[in-house]
């Protein structure tokens, strides 16, 4: 009688492990902080005209900010980086545990800015830099930023000759590992399949952190978060894929 039981148990365990190792699509986004205006956020071809905390699916999204527009997060009205305010329009997605891959084709257009973050892994900390960020500078050169808890060689940029210039579509990819037990994240970034940035074993904030998904719950942010604007700018994300598997 024991042999059939062990066979069934083995089959069940094999099936469970196979299911756990499969990639699963994640697609539950939310607006971050609020809407700047009725043209600032276009989801799947339809403008978001009112703000709420409901989740929605995203295949493509366009973020647009005009000159002088201030973001809706409380900190956006405060001076930072030598500028009087921050412009912001973003959406967020909870970061699952295990391995997560984000992919999208990004297209920028319009006026440059002093700096604009277009991808972040945040932990809801109230001050200081979040664990991982990718931005463009005033010449549209892609640069990395990260929390002050990570240093070279774990956190570094591998090449500086990379751009997101207006009118040039680029394939962006982030490979993320969220270790819930160690309370850390690792991320590797690629542009047109070129490995450009790594942030490894970056610790999450231990206190004073409360984001849209609860205390110390990391999440992804995409969109425009800029200072030093010089005019209207758009960031378009097409063919968005966010997938995860437990490990």
Give each language-model segment a name.
Residues 171-204:
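Carbohydrate-binding surfaces in secreted/extracellular proteins
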Residues 18-20:
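Boundary at the C-terminal end of the N-terminal hydrophobic targeting segment
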Residues 99-107, 171-179, 236, 241-243:
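Residues within well-ordered beta-strands of beta-sheet-rich folds
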Residues 58-144:
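Secretory/extracellular carbohydrate-interaction modules
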Residues 23-28, 96-99, 205-247:
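Ligand-recognition surfaces built from glycine- and aromatic
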Residues 4-13:
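Sec-dependent N-terminal signal peptides
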Residues 29-70:
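Extracellular glycan-recognition surfaces and repeat-rich motifs
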Residues 146-173:
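Short, aromatic/His-centered strand-loop micro-motif at the edge of beta-sheets
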């Amino acid at each position: 009688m024991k042999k059939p039981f062990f066979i069934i148990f083995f089959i069940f365990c094999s099936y469970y492990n196979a299911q756990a190792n499969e990639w699963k699509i994640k697609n539950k986004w939310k607006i971050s902080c609020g809407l700047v205006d009725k043209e600032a956020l276009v989801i799947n071809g339809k403008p978001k005209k009112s703000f709420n905390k409901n989740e929605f699916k995203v295949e493509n999204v366009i973020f647009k900010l005009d000159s002088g527009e201030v973001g809706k997060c409380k900190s956006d009205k405060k001076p930072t980086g030598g500028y009087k305010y921050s412009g912001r329009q973003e959406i967020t997605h909870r970061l699952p545990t295990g391995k997560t891959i984000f992919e999208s084709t990004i297209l920028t257009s319009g006026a440059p800015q002093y700096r604009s973050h277009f991808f972040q892994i945040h932990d809801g900390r109230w001050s200081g830099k979040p664990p991982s960020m990718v931005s463009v500078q005033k010449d549209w050169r892609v640069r990395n930023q990260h929390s002050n808890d990570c240093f070279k060689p774990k956190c570094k940029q591998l090449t500086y000759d990379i751009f997101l210039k207006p009118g040039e579509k680029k394939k962006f990819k982030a490979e993320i590992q969220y270790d819930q037990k160690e309370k850390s994240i690792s991320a590797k970034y690629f542009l047109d399949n070129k490995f450009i940035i790594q942030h490894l074993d970056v610790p999450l904030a231990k206190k004073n952190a409360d984001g849209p998904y609860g205390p110390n719950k990391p999440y992804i942010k995409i969109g425009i978060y800029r200072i030093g604007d010089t005019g209207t700018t758009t960031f378009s994300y097409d063919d968005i894929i966010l997938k995860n598997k437990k490990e």
